[in-house]
Amino acid sequence: MCVQFVSSYGLILRMSVAISTSHRRFSTVAIIGKHGEFGASSSALGELADFLDRRGHQVVFESATAKDLGRSNLIAMTLEQIGRDADVAIVIGGDGTMLGIARQLAPFDVPLIGVNQGRLGFMTDITFERMLPVLSDMLDGKLESERRTLLEGVVHRQGKEIFRSVAFNDVVVSRGAGAGMVELRVEVDAHFMYNQRSDGLIISTPTGSTAYALAAGGPILHPELGGIVLVPIAPHALSNRPIVLSDSCEIVVELASGRDCSVNFDMQSLTSLYHHDRVTVRRSEHSIQFLHPEGWSYYDTLREKLHWNEYPSVLGQLK
């Protein structure tokens, strides 16, 4: 942290001070692992648990992670219990794992640390190989903190609510695999914006702007920007371009025509849509706190994950 005081000469002096908060701030640490064949190995999870225990933290495991580990002396908790009792949660997996965990823990405001065992690792930015030394520094208070927004969406059919969910990346209204284009009527804050014929519409948070929205031609939004981006998917009219809105807006998408349509939230929960169903999307009241290693930068993440400043060689390899 930075301590600021005024000297006898009226000069403002600043000192950078690293304060150990391992026992005060992070007393109870939860470990949540990716399950199944490609999850973290039992030996790696056990090594992490032993490391945290030696540091004096109380270690708890998400229930399925504890079952995968196979030890008898573990404290196992549901995600709801972790949300109530843990001071921080370490999530080991890929971005998909982090998406699901973040959505469920957002109402509890538990800080999340991501250890990457997936492919890209936009949100799980600690490499598996350097997990222990990096976590040691972070749990001593040498870290960066940031907050990310979520979206909440409600589907109404004939005036009645039929489905509700939240999204960390995006809410996507899309056509069925065997159907033609859909026609969507879009309103923003009760103002008609347009009718759009396309394969669908992506409504994205700044976090999701580097995911499906980016692949569909949308802009990258900095996570600290209070915005929501609408990105058409393969629009019939080339004039239907992405647009960035304030995250204070309420967006309503009505299915004017189309077959086998659906709306999904982070590709993890979905429901079918019928003619004249209305999807209302707004910023959620909850947010997610991510903790990163000291010196972390969003621009470093973009440069590394999107391979900026790298150019193909004559052999086709990036340099």
Predicted regions and their residues:
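Short glycine/serine/threonine-rich phosphate/pyrophosphate-binding segments
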Residues: 40-41, 96-102, 209-215
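Catalytic core of DAGKc-family lipid kinases
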Residues: 119-199
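Gly/Ser-rich helix-loop-strand patches that form or flank binding pockets
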Residues: 105-115, 122
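Gly/Ser/Thr-rich active-site loops/lids in small-molecule metabolic enzymes
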Residues: 191-239
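Short, Lys/Arg-enriched N-terminal segments with co-localized hydrophobic residues
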Residues: 5-14, 275
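ATP/nucleoside-binding phosphotransfer catalytic cores, i.e., glycine-rich phosphate-binding loops
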Residues: 173, 189-192, 239-319
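ATP/NTP phosphate-donor binding region
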Residues: 14-88, 92, 100, 129-146, ...
